[in-house]
Amino acid sequence: MLVVTTENIPGKKYEVLGEVFGVTTQSKNFVRNIGAGLKNIVGGEIKDYTKMLHEARMVAIERMKQEATEKGADAIVMMRFDSGSILQDMQSVVAYGTAVKFIED
C-alpha cells in the first residue's frame, strides 16, 4: 500500500475513505534501562532506545496500513506520527493518515 506524507499523489484522483490509525506501546526493559543510565552519565545516543522507537514506528505503520486495507483503501495520504511517554518506562507511537480509494478518470 502506498503511504505518503503529502496531501496529493501526483497523477492520481481519489475519494477519501476516512482517518486510519496504527498504535503501539513499547516498554523499556531492565537491561536497556541500565545501558541508558550509563549513557545518561557520559552522553551519546542510546542505541537500544533508538532501535525500540524505530521498531515501534514500523509496527504503528503496519497497523495503520491494515486498518486502511480493511476500509478498502488503495493508499494513505497525509501520514504523520505522534509519540509520547506513558509513565517512565513506556513509549507510545501513533501513525495516522487519511485512507483513500483511487478513482478512474
Swiss-Prot record:
Transmembrane segments: none annotated. Pfam families: YbjQ_1 (PF01906). It comes from the Bacteria. Belongs to the UPF0145 family. This is UPF0145 protein LSL_1614. The lineage of its organism: Bacteria, Bacillati, Bacillota, Bacilli, Lactobacillales.
